[in-house]
Amino acid sequence: MKVLSALCVLLVSVATAKQQLSEVEYRNAFTNWMIAHQRHYSSEEFNGRYNIFKANMDYVNEWNTKGSETVLGLNVFADISNEEYRATYLGTPFDASSLEMTESDKIFDASAQVDWRTQGAVTPIKNQGQCGGCWSFSTTGATEGAQYLANGKKNLVSLSEQNLIDCSGSYGNNGCEGGLMTLAFEYIINNKGIDTESSYPYTAEDGKKCKFNPKNVAAQLSSYVNVTSGSESDLAAKVTQGPTSVAIDASNQSFQLYVSGIYNEPACSSTQLDHGVLAVGFGTGSGSSGSHGGSQSQSAGSDSQSAGSESSQSESGSQSQSESGSQSQSQSGSQSFSGSLYSGSYSGSQSGSQSGNSGAAVKQTGAGSGSGSGSGSGSGSGSGSVSGSASGSASGSASGSSSGSNSNGGVYPTAGDYWIVKNSWGTSWGMDGYILMTKGNNNQCGIATMASRPTAVASL
């Protein structure tokens, strides 16, 4: 994880620099990103992915220079277009405009803060992979929390998303093509339970038949309640009682490339909802994704995906690529970065050679500076090498370390009211798999438009 942290610091600082990047800088950033995320491209695919990466890097640069509380970066989705991202990881938008949009008459203390991760009610971040089964992860997350609370805060058990994908089709869900959390709750209620993750593991694809086994049931639901549509105060009341399933608009490029801070996207829709997630708390003022026991542990499955393939995340590794021409370079120096949310420094070195379209050999040494996001200080070192030929092979490795701290004990500081939302894209996305979404901001992204919280049967 140390190498990835160091590389991420470098990539974010390059991406936030207020200057036009050279082709060499783009290529260096892409090479480092490929090594960190262990990407493998065919010769036919490489140039297309590189151009998409450059466009995403430009978008990140432009966004971050505006000083938003939302910080973007070159995360696990940096090599796919927004169209690919929506088609692969999101469901078909559900039109919730017909839902009654009224404010709840419940009175709620807006100063209160809740984080169910600190109560042991949230399982580690999971990864849906290239399957549009987000609804199943939202459902299991809410059910896991409900069962844990019904059992007196004892025995948190990870539940099977594959059980829901394979077996709830008759209720209206469509596996990897999408579904609704309420329909999944109905299935669990009528089915008298859902199996454990360990007994019915996730495959990231539609199963050919339902393999539910009542002997492996680890949770049962008695009912569920819907949040008053559009009411964030009612959503807060429900989240105070336990983790709550919510549907949101996650279609924007800013959501795709989110890395930290409070997510605030005015272009978000409150009625066109395409992603199921889990609200596990809310807060105000300085907040973070936090590190609360198991909730921040490595998830089941891989953290790194690209269009058409999946690979596992690691701190060092190698990959292949193909281009025409050749290019070699070596670089050493230091990188500094500062911003309203993050201040610190990165130092390190890298060297290598890679194939490239320019056919020119370039060597450079020096230091660079940029701006970034976060709070604290960090230092790290890294080295990497890439070699390639016209036939299209390349290998690379990276090693290094980084360290950092800030006033919040090493976490990203933010300001404002926010929802703590658990996603299902692995720990390489967002803040260790979480996103902080703006709260009390006109139901932005539809956070309270279509939300539900289940109630579990005790003593399971």
UniProtKB/Swiss-Prot annotation:
Q: Which cysteines are joined by disulfide bonds?
A: C131-C176, C167-C210, C268-C445
**Active-site residues?**
C134, H275, N423
List the PROSITE patterns.
Answer: THIOL_PROTEASE_ASN, THIOL_PROTEASE_CYS, THIOL_PROTEASE_HIS
Q: Where is the composition biased (Low complexity)?
A: 294-359, 386-409
Q: Which residues are modified by glycosylation?
A: N226, N252
As given in the record, the signal peptide range reads 1-17
Q: Which UniProt keywords apply?
A: Disulfide bond, Glycoprotein, Hydrolase, Lysosome, Phosphoprotein, Protease, Signal, Thiol protease, Zymogen
- What does the similarity note say? Belongs to the peptidase C1 family.
What this protein is called in its record is Cysteine proteinase 7
